[in-house]
Amino acid sequence: MDTDLSPQDRKDLDKFIKFFALKSVQVIVQARLGDKICTRSSSSPTGSDWFNLAIKDIPEVTHEAKKALSGQLPAVGRSMCVEISLKTSEGDSMELEVWCLEMNEKCDRDIKVSYTVYNRLSLLLKSLLAVTRVTPAYRLSRKQGHEYVILYRIYFGDVQLLGLKEGFQAVRVGTVGTPVGTLTLTCAYRTNLAFMSTRQYEWTQPIMGIIIDHFVDRPFPSTSHMHPCNYRGAEEQVLTYPAVEESQEVCTTSFSTSPPSQLCSSRLSYQPAVPGAGPSELGYPVALATGVSAGHPHQMMAPGKESGLPAVSVQPAHGNQAEHDRTLSVSPANVAGTTSSSEEADSPSGSSTTGAKSSPNKNTHVLFTRKVGAFVDKPSPQVTYASTDIPFAVFVPKLADNEDTDPMVVYPETPEEESPEARSLHSSCSSSGTPQDDFVMVDFKPAFSKDDLPMDVGTFYREFQNPPQLSSLSIDIAVQSMAEDLDSLPEKLAMHEKNMKEFDAFVDSL
């Protein structure tokens, strides 16, 4: 099988399969980051663009892929698999899909390694780039956040499809024939996304402390652990990866027609955190023109994982000034955090810093005069921006939605004019001396209401504060009613004597 291949073709084929496997892992994991990835195309690709695709490698993913491969290549009976799963904030997990790169024994002896295999692998990688966006896991990855995260796991060996449960679907992304076998890239994804908590099936702790499943072998004990696609816990250890990974080797083979250009790493090289940099110094974005490092004129400081400050090289590959002046966009796939450092930023006047920290007592104030439209009562305020908290105060937009609630707006101290109603209110309150004048009645006319309201709160309080005297307490009325009762007493007695028999009969009946 291998006798027909020359040593150079065999070396090129192994190299193509190796970097295709590494690039496939990058494409799958980056498709589950939850963010859209925008890559700027270039008319002059360099030798580091494998398979004619400018895929920005994540060093952590490349490290995990190489650790899973351990120097092996996908061959007959040996498959490289990438498992994508979902984990909730409560600890429940669910496998979503499994991507598998395997090889069978069907060979194509007449195919040319240098041209045909390389081009077909490039087409297969582009197909993978499209298929990763149409499976159900892609929609879930776009909605990940505090409730759940998407995890990935890379392992080498037999395909494990038990976690997908019943009803999973399998799709073949594509195949590429080689002189040593046929590479096949497939995907098995879960169709039943109804989540069922696995915590209800967990064993409860025995009373006697006996481990029930002590002699039960765990399934796949040698497989690697799950890793978050775009989430890193604070307790995880930050690993330092080299600036230029092995996957960024110049693609120079026996069929290369152009000389290898100077390799320029556009990836994030992880540097140790700057000592003395507080959280307030890492909370503002980095501008391209002001984020140039003093040590290297072609490096820009960009946010790294765990508040690290990686250096992004902006040196052009061919020395073109147009390539150097292009705006660099740092992909969230390469950056775990969302904060960036303003330590290396230039001052608004244009003077560049050399790493020394500016003293906090040197505050530069930038004054803006906001334009006020017609029919505005208050004068135009002068807005003062302190450059101690904002590194680039000149770039702060001059228009604000709400000036009253803006903490950075400083209005000049002007005496406030009181309205006549307010002056009358204060004068009435200050001149009040009797208990009846403690409450000042202000005419209140609510919108969409009648002017002749029968009663309001003030009228109600006034009436019950000074209630009228009870009629029963009046002496004249009491004397008059008693005289009337005495005058009518003989008539009542005569009526009682007249009806004496009826009253006696009523008493006897009781």
From Swiss-Prot:
It is found in: Cytoplasm, Cytosol; Preautophagosomal structure. Residues 354-363 have a biased composition (Polar residues). InterPro entries: ATG13, Atg13_N, HORMA_dom_sf. Phosphorylated under nutrient-rich conditions; dephosphorylated during starvation or following treatment with rapamycin. It comes from Xenopus tropicalis. This is Autophagy-related protein 13. Autophagy factor required for autophagosome formation. Target of the TOR kinase signaling pathway that regulates autophagy through the control of the phosphorylation status of ATG13 and ULK1, and the regulation of the ATG13-ULK1-RB1CC1 complex. The keyword Phosphoprotein does not apply. Residues 338-353 have a biased composition (Low complexity). Its main location: cytoplasm. It holds the Pfam family ATG13. Residues 295-363, 413-432 are annotated as: Disordered. Belongs to the ATG13 family. Metazoan subfamily.
